[in-house]
Structure formats: structure tokens, C-alpha cells
Amino acid sequence: MNNLALQSLTESIAIKYFGKAFKHEVYYNKRLRTTGGRYILSSHNIEINPKQYEMFGEKAVIDIIKHELCHYFLHLAGEGYQHRDKAFKSLSAKVGAPRFCTPTESYQDRANYKYRCIYCEQEFIRIKRVNLEKMRCGRCGGILKLLQTRK
């Protein structure tokens, strides 16, 4: 599915589920890594993670579009468009937009660092580096040792 097909799909979803026209752009952004899509407040455009389509198909993209269109229409109407707002929760439930999408990578796949406590030998994996002088084992309070890095 290219950007043109994505645009027409979004316009049809907007009419079908929201009864309003989508008048801005929707496109794939390959730089999105940990999110399925995002609504940009300043330009009113919607960006979609192409990995979601590649891994999970059109159904996943439709769900992401519905979610982002909830942000879009509520923001343009001047209502609460954030996840915590009552208006957002009720609109997303009404149109069947899920709150989250399926992650493209698991935490284990994204982890770059592996640590082990020298006392109880509990292992910890982390995406970001940990300051070993400040951090201790959450289980026994022992000293952590870096085992391996992926970066």
C-alpha cells in the first residue's frame, strides 16, 4: 500500500466511521519506531509506521488510522483530544479504535545492554545504558555488572 492508497483509505474511514471529511494528508514515516502512528497538531497531518502494514496487514493500519482520526476530529472541534480526555475515550470506543497497536519489536529485541547482579545473579536487560555507580540490584541491593552490549 503506497501513500496514495493510504490517503484514500483514510478518507473513506473518516466518512464511514466519523461522518466527516479528512482534509489533510496521511503518509508513511519510516522513522517511527515505537509507535504505530501519530497526529501532528501543527499541520493536522497523520503519519503511519510502515512496519505495521508490513508485519500485521491492512487491519492494523485501519485501527491505527481510526485512532489517529479520533485525535484529528476532536482537536479540530476544540474538544479534549488527548488519551486521558473523556471525549477521546468515548469517541474511540464509539468507532472501535483500539488504544494501543501491536508492537513491531519486543523489549528483548530492542534491548542493547545486559546486566547481572554479582551477588544473586539476577539478570536485567535494558534499552538505555545504566549508571553502574548509582544503580543497584532491585532484588538484593547488590552491585551490577555489564555482561554484554549490542551497540
UniProtKB/Swiss-Prot annotation:
Pfam families: SprT-like (PF10263), Zn_ribbon_SprT (PF17283). GO terms for molecular function: zinc ion binding. InterPro entries: SprT-like_domain (IPR006640), SprT_Zn_ribbon (IPR035240), Uncharacterised_SprT-like (IPR023524). Binds 1 zinc ion. Its cofactor is Zn(2+). GO terms for cellular component: cytoplasm. The active site is at E68. The keyword Metal-binding applies. It comes from the Bacteria. Belongs to the SprT family. Zn(2+) binds at H67, H71. This is Protein SprT-like. Its main location: cytoplasm. GO terms for biological process: response to stress. Residues 7-146 form the SprT-like domain. SMART domains: SprT. The keyword Zinc applies. It is found in: Cytoplasm. Keywords: Cytoplasm, Metal-binding, Zinc.
